[in-house]
Amino acid sequence: PEGITAGIEISDCEIFEVDGENRRAMPAYQSMYWNGAVYVTFPGRTSAQDHLHDIVISNNYIHDVRTSGIRVNQQEDFINDIHHTHVVVRGNRIERTGSDGVIVANCISPLIDSNVCFDAGALGTLEDTQLIAGIWVCATRDALIQRNEVARTRMFENDGTAFDTDWGTAGTTVFQYNYSHDNEGGFWLDCMKLNHNRDC
């Protein structure tokens, strides 16, 4: 679509037994990065004139899903398309996924706040899932990730961390007041070589 798609709220739902895709090595737009138990996307590429605005995903219980828990992105995979505005992922509980817990992409100043993510990747496999993290951002600017708890994230080939700043992370990314424990890959993965106290 053209223009700004605004005012989407997904709140106070229980979402479970979603049989999505958890394979990483699938063709583009068919892999685990293009679906989710809660999946909000924009067809094609975004711009200052064409993007998502005012997206709220809050207070949901998402569990036992074969795919990721929550995902926000655009359909085309371009790391410089950072245009979605006022995206909030808050107060969700995510347990036992087939891949990642939460991924937010293509957003300006997204807020990821007060979520619980346990056992990300519990329903995945080494052959299919390969690389995951609990909560992470990519192609974002000035993301704020705070007051989240992430535990028992699986590690397959690599990664397996609670948090991740991945490709296209720009501006200043802030992690504060989060609690990470018992994740097979540790606390945080940085794919962007960010500078401490400047970029993150």
Regions found by a protein language model. Give the residues of each.
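Extended surface/linker regions that mediate inter-domain or inter-protein docking
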Residues: 14-16, 41, 62
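Repeated loop/turn-to-beta-strand initiation elements of outer-membrane beta-barrel proteins
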Residues: 19, 66, 110, 143-144
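Extracellular beta-strand/beta-solenoid scaffold signature
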Residues: 1, 23-52, 64-80, 84, ...
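Flexible loop/turn segments at secondary-structure boundaries
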Residues: 79, 110-111, 143, 153, ...
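Core solenoid repeat modules with strong leucine/isoleucine-rich periodicity
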Residues: 118-134, 138-142, 146-155, 162-164, ...
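Short, solvent-exposed beta-strand-terminating loops
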Residues: 5, 18-25
